[in-house]
């Protein structure tokens, strides 16, 4: 099975060390462009662009990278409860059209009540997933060309429609990650690819089995992906030295503050990440070549595969054997590590190198009439 390998645009900052401004690097448009172009040339399928108050806006960053890349896809966040499904569908179709079919979408419900309150969202965990499920039903139907009337507990639309369809048909793929029961229910019913953070293989195997069973109950199948950091070097010894250097400037106070911030979140996935290391730095190899040091201070994905190319490839193939076909990777600093992954890891994997998409002609049309419909040619009698 050919694997889809993604990279990451660090719009929330980058550098040589975690939890310190030592070795930090300005993240401006030029730097993000360098990373995107490196990923494009090396053969990564796409890039994940993060979302949240600590990040630049993912949609604007993705749009700015379209003209400077050829085949790279952009995985950007859909934010239920922050934007209406109709507006989000319109934005999604436009991004897909502007990129000639290179848009992918990642449903993000949010996990930090404090940050969500700042965005005007005051729903609890269960209610957020209810709202996300309603949002996704409307969003999918609109992109698939339906005119939608919908009234739910959280969302109500009447006569919603898109005049300009996406390039990808029936619609661009929808990604989603969540470890709670309600999250898995949503994934099973509506998404195309279920994402997990980099837990040990046995835990990932259990989650995949749960989502597969729930999807089968809906008569559906779901693809699977995993989010991991990577520290790959010419030798495994060098890789572990690089892992140690990454947290060399971390002190106990910084770790404690980070873990306290994570503890206020209601994300089951974040709780599972924190449990892998318990805030301690003395037992960070939690599974062969799987290192939890990143999660001491980084929210979300907190584990890294560490080793030389053949070793990391073997671990990736262990996950692939569980049914995972997409790997969203990253490393610090992201420009240099993109090249290390391309040079040291890619030769040992069956990587699905994307083709350069050919321009797809769009149907000729005049200006929308009364902002309501597209004019059609009238047959002459």
Swiss-Prot record:
Give the matching CDD domains: Alkanesulfonate_monoxygenase
In the record, the note on similarity to other proteins reads: Belongs to the SsuD family.
**Which keywords accompany this UniProt record?**
Flavoprotein, FMN, Monooxygenase, Oxidoreductase
Note the Pfam families from the entry. Bac_luciferase
The gene name reads ssuD
Q: Which reaction does it catalyse?
A: an alkanesulfonate + FMNH2 + O2 = an aldehyde + FMN + sulfite + H2O + 2 H(+)
- What InterPro entries does the record tag this protein with? Alkanesulphonate_mOase_FMN-dep, Luciferase-like_dom, Luciferase-like_sf, SsuD_RutA_monooxygenase
The record makes one more remark, namely: FMNH(2) which is absolutely required for this enzymatic reaction, is provided by SsuE.
Task: Give the GO molecular function terms.
Answer: alkanesulfonate monooxygenase activity
- Cystine bridges: none
Its recorded name reads Alkanesulfonate monooxygenase
The catalytic activity of this protein is classed by the Enzyme Commission as 1.14.14.5
